[in-house]
């Protein structure tokens, strides 16, 4: 992993997550806690309370039907968060990004590159690229349950070496203001070493470092848990 030149001094910046929505899969809808319009109201209040200090807010549940949906893809904005006056939720998201600047706040994204679901459009590509953790028989194997669905773990080695990570990340940068934000929060960026008999922890760690280097080459800081 290369030495980084950070875009922000995180020791002098208030940075936090904002939980917008989560899936309600049985009813095929998003359970919304905070819309994009309501998020700006909160940002204004926080700015007043903090006397205008620099802030970064990472949006959680901005994609798909909400938190823990669509991973590891990052291109479908949650339509339930849209402002009525906007054509699409993506338009509303960009509006929030621009408006938040007036209140000393950078809006960015909470994303996940460790988990995958069969309903995610790129899941067949992940399997083909050997980018999903498998069992000893070579079969992709779920290891957790999120929102009532089987959750699979991403093999960073296959994900990066196949070029699929770069493809998904470039698409993310083209559609969302993440380059402009200059920072992103990657959730649960762990290594499923004991679950993957085909790669070592050293292989996965090296691939994760390559992913971090790639994101940094796009001019984006990475924060994580």
Annotate each PLM feature.
Residues 1-2:
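Extended acidic/polar, glycine-enriched regions
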Residues 6-168, 181-186, 190-195:
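Aromatic-lined carbohydrate-binding/catalytic grooves of carbohydrate-active enzymes
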Residues 156-225:
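Active-site neighborhood of glycoside hydrolase catalytic domains
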């Amino acid at each position: 992993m290369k030495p980084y030149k950070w875009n922000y001094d995180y020791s002098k910046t208030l940075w936090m997550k904002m939980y917008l929505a989560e899936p309600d899969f049985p009813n095929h809808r998003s359970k919304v806690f905070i819309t994009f319009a309501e998020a700006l109201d909160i940002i204004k209040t926080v700015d007043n309370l903090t006397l205008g200090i620099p802030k970064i807010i990472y949006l959680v549940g901005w994609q798909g039907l909400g938190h823990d949906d669509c991973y590891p893809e990052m291109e479908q904005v949650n339509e339930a968060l849209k402002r009525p006056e906007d054509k699409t939720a993506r338009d509303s998201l960009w509006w929030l990004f621009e408006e938040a600047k007036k209140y000393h706040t950078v809006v960015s994204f909470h994303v996940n590159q460790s988990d995958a679901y069969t309903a995610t459009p790129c899941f067949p590509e992940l399997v083909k690229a050997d980018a999903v953790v498998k069992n000893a028989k070579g079969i992709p194997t779920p290891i957790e349950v999120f929102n009532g669905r089987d959750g699979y773990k991403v093999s960073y080695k296959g994900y990066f070496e196949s070029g699929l990570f770069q493809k998904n990340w470039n698409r993310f940068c083209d559609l969302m203001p993440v380059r402009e934000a200059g920072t992103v929060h990657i959730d649960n960026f762990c290594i499923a070493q004991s679950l993957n008999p085909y790669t070592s922890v050293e292989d996965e760690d090296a691939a994760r470092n390559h992913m971090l280097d790639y994101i940094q080459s796009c001019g984006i800081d990475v924060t994580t848990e």
